[in-house]
Amino acid sequence: MKKIFILCFLLCACETVDRSTMNSVRLKSDATTDSIEHVVKEMLIAISTNDIEKARYHVFEDGRVFRIRKDGIGFRSNTDFFKQTADQSTDYFERMWDPIIMYRGDLAIAWTTYDFHLNGKFSHCGAESFTLTRFNNRWMVVDWAYTANETENCNSPLGPIEK
């Protein structure tokens, strides 16, 4: 419970920070931060392509997903995430920008802004936080949380989606 409270506090704190302040935060890039960022990007590609095998490769099955919205916090297991990712009836597309990555030893956190599209139409944007661990010499997403409130002021520097 303490872990959930801290995670929620950090995400709420991030929501109150001026985006121009966050754009000035740049941490040193190295082989480890690059490999952590790669895993997060691959996970988002798995979501966007309904690639269940890629999702299972990069996401630890026993983890959880936390969704934070104005109407409350929702939880689901990564197993449920896998089922949703495998669902070919919905076209998901998610992309991120300006990731901030920190690590020490076999523990890492990636924080980023993102936008999300359903069936080719913009749905929402927000902040997303990933907890990763190095397991059998490779990074895997264990838990992640995201805000899903914003439908305005979602000016992605990536421009409109191209499929």
What are these regions (language model features)?
Residues I4-C12:
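Sec-dependent N-terminal signal peptides
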Residues S77-S123:
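Surface-exposed, charged secondary-structure patches
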Residues T21, A127-N155:
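Short beta-strand edge/turn micro-motifs at domain boundaries
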Residues R64-G74, D87-Q88:
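A short gly/proline-enriched turn/hairpin at secondary-structure junctions
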Residues M43, A55-R56, G63, A110, ...:
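Hydrophobic pocket/interface hotspot
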